[in-house]
Amino acid sequence: MLTQKPKGTNDLFPPEVFLWEEIERKFREVCRRFGYQEIRTPIFEHTELFERGVGETTDIVEKEMYTFLDKAGRSITLRPEGTAAVIRAYVEAKKYADPGPAKYFYIGPMFRYDKPQAGRLRQFHQLGVEILGSDEPMVDAEVILMALEFYREIGLNDVELRLNSVGCPECRKSLREKLINYFEERKEELCDLCKARLNRNPLRILDCKNESCQKIAQNAPTPLSELCPDCREHFTEVRKYLDLAQVKYVIDPFLVRGLDYYTKTAFEFVVPEIGAQSSIGGGGRYNGLIREIGGPDQPGIGFALGEERTILALKRKSEEISVPVPDLFVCLLGEEAREYGFPLINELRRLNLWVETDYQGKSLKAQLKAANRLKAKAALIIGEEELKSGRFILRDLDTGEQVELSRDELIEKYARERGKDNA
């Protein structure tokens, strides 16, 4: 066990980790174009935060959380999702008093004790955003548009948007009663989990993946059928802005998401080609969550995109994201060359170059072989003859062409290419 990673976790090595870096870089770029700033919260919180925020009757709270007592006897939970922690930080720091709306993004690991499979791990990573302080339908549409823009940036152009409105607490009063009556008559056909949900959270039955439950739910009342006038108008406006932006979507009346805090707009991003875990992200509005966690009655909306599932979708589509390679491999031949080259390499790195070298005193042939294995763009050769002449060989490893340069000419060349005048 000492050398085995825990079940449901992954180790990332190059070049795989370069793909993650590129995805996170592009997500940050998109977030900043839309005016979002990064927030970082602890990976563990007081358990009560998730019980109240996510909902005590959700699958996450009931059976998927990593919860333990710390040495002071306090119940602590590794975060199973990002929204509740962001809201807690927002309320604790009284950021709600600042001119709004507040716009945050986050990138990081989440933890759920779930059955590991492709696209579903016990430690997984999310790219998320939250915008707090606005109930405008245009904000809902912009948040959705932002996620789709990120997918477009990384090459996922055929992501399907599924859209619904789950209404407000007032809407759901009548819906809850109708759902209980409907499913009570068909209770024996429900799975055991949905039987338990029936009187506690009947809305979740609409989202059950059990085939029998799905068949029964086809004719059940849905949130869309019970929307109050305000929620209906809000949903109409959200769709209007999506239409103006020429965003394609599918209305899914059974989409309710897995968290209790959602109100009004709910959405998911789906790539059917990746199989059972076809949902690669989703989100929605949560207008009561800030108040529930102890803040003022402010609205909010956000999304979380699964990083592992996004990468799985990219790989299934054979989309390639460029992997960085060294700019230069410096071949140092002999101790004198090593002493001369050591500070030179540092100077080159200060020009923002990725520079590799040999540390073991290998032959020129072996060093050039190492440079090619790393796919370095060029090799700089410094040996006894080069030190005597003061001119070093710079070889393009793609074309084989080479030139002789002095130290100053070498620095000037790379400074010019990097847009720096360090000559």
UniProtKB/Swiss-Prot annotation:
Belongs to the class-II aminoacyl-tRNA synthetase family. It catalyses: tRNA(His) + L-histidine + ATP = L-histidyl-tRNA(His) + AMP + diphosphate + H(+). The lineage of its organism: Bacteria, Bacillati, Bacillota, Clostridia, Thermoanaerobacterales. PROSITE patterns: AA_TRNA_LIGASE_II (PS50862). One of its GO terms (molecular function) is catalytic activity, acting on a protein. GO terms for biological process: histidyl-tRNA aminoacylation. It is found in: Cytoplasm. One of its GO terms (cellular component) is cytoplasm. This is Histidine--tRNA ligase. SUPFAM superfamilies: Class II aaRS ABD-related, Class II aaRS and biotin synthetases. InterPro entries: aa-tRNA-synth_II, aa-tRNA-synth_II/BPL/LPL, Anticodon-bd, Anticodon-bd_dom_sf, His-tRNA-ligase, HisRS-like_core, HisRS/HisZ, HisRS_anticodon. Gene3D superfamilies: Anticodon-binding domain (3.40.50.800), Bira Bifunctional Protein, Domain 2 (3.30.930.10). It comes from the Bacteria. Homodimer. Keywords: Aminoacyl-tRNA synthetase, ATP-binding, Cytoplasm, Ligase, Nucleotide-binding, Protein biosynthesis. Its EC number is 6.1.1.21. Its main location: cytoplasm. It holds the Pfam family HGTP_anticodon. It comes from Carboxydothermus hydrogenoformans (strain ATCC BAA-161 / DSM 6008 / Z-2901).
